[in-house]
Structure formats: structure tokens, C-alpha cells
């Protein structure tokens, strides 16, 4: 499914924009601060309900306005879908799909699977475990129909259990939460383990093409000891959890470790190599989705030339074209993307929030 039309109103520095888009490559060219990243962020927000540069909604609403409006048309193989998102300064959202209100942001995310590659995206590799859990959970969300509800219930139960730990003195007092928590935790961990195992070959093949000089390995760690029942871990850790006032073990502590030649990638690879690895992982994830479900990812790439030389930019461009996915690329200069363009691509110029093609 590709985004054929995008309407933006009062988002960042963009007052109004109505863009007819290519199902292939779409290039956004402009100086720093022109608004090209804001277009990428508008697309991301339409599919996630939140921006990727700020969690504070007031910062993405145009100055002196009360809300932003985003609208898109998605073209699938058999039908067109209309989607919209409105959000005000209080954080209240309204999601519309095919003209009807009352929908959830998760429905937008299912309709618009997308991969984001930004200069700040190194956190996937050198940030905390939560970024790598998010990587796995993206895949589980799009591959397992029950994942989102299970994950939402897990978060709710952990919050309730942590609150209870501040008030109780005996394990029996938190057992009711644990009886619900354990099966959810084990199911989510199984999904994550299955997904990480399923995508491992795709990641290895893609990384070998991007970084042939390294031997890369991937390992999923579920968040508690191997070969130990989660129920046993919770009961055994109760006193420590009560002192900490939070649950120290579980799927919320899982990680997905990536090593190069046996060492953590953040200690081994240069910034340029880290960006290549990040691109390889995002590509592998999108290609795995297509193979498993027939759906294609939408790729958002901010500051395409950053950290990459001409040869590596060419490699990334050729791999993206091979996916036959819709791609949005921002760049300071058209020269950085001219060799990627073809008769089906579109070039947009962005200047002070105004977008022309």
C-alpha cells in the first residue's frame, strides 16, 4: 500500500500543503530548517499518532494555532483507503478512516507499516535495550494479530504491580497480578523469540552485503533467566522488587544484542558503519514483512547523505529500489539524490515551509 496523497495543515512550519506522491521515490530537497524533515515527520505522525522529534504535541503544532490536521490516501492492490489524524495542544486526538471517526492510532499503524532512518537513529544500536525491544515489537505487531492487545495488557499489569509493591508486605498480596502477568509475559517472549529467529537470516544476508568486513551475530534475551519459569522468578524476586518498588525481571527488560566480531557493535563500528548497519536492519525488517505478509513498508530517510560515501549511498539506493516500496528521502542538495531518481520518482523543493514540485 502506498501513500498517493498527503495533506498537511498547521504542522511544524507548514501552514498548508497538498502533495500528489509517487508510489516509488519521493525526494524532499531544501536547506536546513526549510521544512523537509517536517514532511517526513508528518507522514510518520499520520502512521503513529506522534512525532519522532518531539513527544510534546505543542511543539509540532504551528505557532499560534490550536491543532494540526493530517490527511492521506492509501492505494492498495484492490482499494483506496482514506485516513486522517487531528491533534490539539491538549493532546486530544481524532482518528478517521474512510470517513468514520472513533478509530485508534494502532489501526493507522497497521495500515501504514513504515521504517524510519534518521541521523538520530543510532539509538537502535548504541542506546538502551528499550530501542531494540521496540525493533522486535514492531515486527511482532505486524506479524502477530494478538500482539498489540497482549502488549497493552502487559504494560497495564506491570504498572499496577509496581504500584502494589509500594504498599504490600507479603508475596501473596501481589500474586493476583502475577497470575495474569505470567501467561502474557511468556506469550510475548515467545513471539519475540520466534520473530528474532525468523528474521535472523534476512539480517545476516543484508548485513553481509552492507558490512562484509564484519561477522555479525544477533541474540535475543528475554529479560529473565533461561530455563526458569517466570512465575518462579517473580516469587523469588519479590523482596528485592518490593525494595526497588518496581518489577526487575520480565519482558520489559528484554534485549536484542548485536555483536560484530564478538564485540558490541557500538564499541567496534564507526559512525558510517553504524549507519549502514542501521539501514541494513531496517531493510531486512521491511523485506521480512513483505515475504511473510505480502505487505510493503514505507521508508522515511532523513538526511540521506549523512555519514555515507557515494558507493554506500548507491548500495542503499539500489537495495531500496529492489524492495519496490514507497520511499521518502530528504537531502540538502538535489545532487545527493539525482542518481536515485527515475521517470517514476518525484522531486519536491522545500523552502520556509512551502513545498513545490
UniProtKB/Swiss-Prot annotation:
Gene Ontology terms describing biological process: DNA replication; DNA synthesis involved in DNA repair; double-strand break repair; SOS response
Alphabetical keyword list: ATP-binding, Cytoplasm, DNA damage, DNA repair, DNA replication, DNA-binding, Nucleotide-binding, SOS response
Keyword Transport: no
Protein name, as recorded: DNA replication and repair protein RecF
Family designation: Belongs to the RecF family.
Record function comment: The RecF protein is involved in DNA metabolism; it is required for DNA replication and normal SOS inducibility. RecF binds preferentially to single-stranded, linear DNA. It also seems to bind ATP.
GO cellular component assignments: cytoplasm
Subcellular localization, as worded in the UniProt entry: Cytoplasm
GO MF annotation list: ATP binding; single-stranded DNA binding
Keyword Nucleotide-binding assigned: yes
Binding site for ATP: 30-37
Amino acid at each position: 500500500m502506498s501513500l498517493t496523497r498527503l495533506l498537511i495543515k498547521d504542522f511544524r512550519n507548514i501552514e498548508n500543503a497538498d502533495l500528489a506522491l509517487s508510489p516509488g521515490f519521493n525526494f524532499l530537497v531544501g536547506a536546513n530548517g526549510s521544512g523537509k524533515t517536517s514532511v517526513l515527520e508528518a507522514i510518520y505522525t499520520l502512521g503513529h499518532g506522534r512525532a519522532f522529534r518531539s513527544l510534546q504535541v505543542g511543539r509540532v503544532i504551528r505557532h499560534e494555532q490550536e491543532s494540526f490536521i493530517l490527511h492521506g490516501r492509501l492505494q492498495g492492490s484492490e482499494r483506496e483507503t482514506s485516513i486522517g489524524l487531528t491533534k490539539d495542544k491538549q493532546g486530544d486526538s481524532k482518528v478517521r478512516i474512510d470517513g468514520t471517526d472513533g478509530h485508534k492510532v494502532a489501526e493507522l499503524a497497521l495500515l501504514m507499516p513504515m521504517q524510519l532512518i534518521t541521523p538520530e537513529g543510532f539509538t537502535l544500536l548504541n542506546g538502551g535495550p528499550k530501542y531494540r525491544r521496540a525493533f522486535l515489537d514492531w515486527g511482532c505487531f505486524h506479524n502477530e494479530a494478538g500482539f498489540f492487545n497482549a502488549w497493552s495488557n502487559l504494560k497495564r499489569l506491570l504498572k499496577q504491580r509496581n504500584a502494589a509493591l509500594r504498599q504490600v508486605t507479603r508475596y501473596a498480596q501481589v500474586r493476583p497480578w502475577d497470575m495474569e502477568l505470567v501467561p502474557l509475559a511468556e506469550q510475548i517472549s515467545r513471539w519475540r523469540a520466534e520473530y528474532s529467529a525468523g528474521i535472523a537470516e534476512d539480517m545476516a544476508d543484508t548485513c553481509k552485503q552492507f558490512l562484509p568486513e564484519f561477522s555479525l551475530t544477533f541474540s535475543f534475551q528475554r529479560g529473565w533467566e533461561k530455563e526458569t519459569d517466570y512465575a518462579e522468578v517473580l516469587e523469588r524476586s519479590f523482596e528485592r522488587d518490593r525494595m526497588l518498588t518496581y518489577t526487575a525481571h520480565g519482558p520489559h527488560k528484554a534485549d536484542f544484542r548485536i555483536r560484530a566480531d564478538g564485540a558490541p557493535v557500538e564499541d567496534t563500528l564507526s559512525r558510517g558503519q553504524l549507519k549502514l548497519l542501521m539501514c541494513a536492519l531496517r531493510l531486512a525488517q521491511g523485506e521480512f514483512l513483505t515475504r511473510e505478509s505480502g505487505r510493503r513498508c514505507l521508508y522515511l530517510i532523513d538526511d540521506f547523505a549523512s555519514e555515507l560515501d557515494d558507493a554506500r549511498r548507491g548500495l542503499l539506493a539500489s537495495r531500496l529500489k529492489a524492495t519496490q516500496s514507497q520511499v521518502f528521502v530528504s537531502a540538502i542538495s538535489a545532487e545527493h539524490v539525482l542518481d536515485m531518481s527515475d521517470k517514476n520518482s518525484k522531486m519536491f523543493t522545500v523552502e520556509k515551509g512551502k513545498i513545490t514540485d
